[in-house]
């Protein structure tokens, strides 16, 4: 695993949360967990370090399928108060932790416009689709990021930064 320039690899999520004034367990993560339980979608890891992972970062919810993994991140307010480099480095380090599997990341903003019922239905269907189809294998990096409830400006910003950070590692 290569370190990400400008982002300390030893940064703990709790440290980031303290630095940016975010509580450690958010109500929308708890609500999402209720939805997952109600729908029968079972995750393998939630808010804890992956076994034997070379990183201290951990997923909100990690689902393990036969050929790939699906990472669900509950990003309140598009995580706009978070350091974007830290966000991208975190996903990269989690990708490095799932040895030879491709990764489908769903970044879900529970504060997007629209009804909670519609956001719930869309999210649960996205997870089912991601588990059924290994979309990550279609991308050279082995990783695909799907944004739910994000503004187009934020998606463009994060994608551009992600590409720039990947180019630094080449």
Predicted feature locations:
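Nucleic-acid endo/exonuclease domains
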Residues: 1-170
């Amino acid at each position: 695993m290569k370190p990400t320039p400008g982002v300390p690899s030893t940064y703990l999520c709790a440290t980031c949360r303290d630095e940016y004034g975010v509580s450690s367990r958010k109500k929308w993560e708890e609500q999402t967990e209720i939805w997952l339980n109600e729908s029968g979608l079972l995750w393998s890891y939630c808010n804890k370090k992956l076994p034997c992972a070379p990183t201290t970062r951990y997923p909100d919810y990690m689902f393990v399928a036969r050929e790939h993994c699906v990472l669900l991140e509950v990003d309140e307010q598009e995580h706009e108060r978070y350091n974007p480099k830290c966000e991208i480095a975190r996903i990269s380090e989690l990708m490095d932790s799932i040895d030879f599997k491709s990764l489908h990341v769903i970044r879900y903003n529970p504060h997007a416009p629209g009804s909670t019922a519609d956001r719930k239905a869309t999210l649960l269907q996205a997870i089912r689709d991601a588990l059924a189809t290994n979309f990550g294998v279609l991308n050279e990096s082995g990783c695909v990021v799907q944004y739910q409830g994000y503004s187009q400006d934020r998606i463009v910003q994060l994608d551009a930064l992600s590409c720039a950070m990947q180019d630094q590692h080449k």
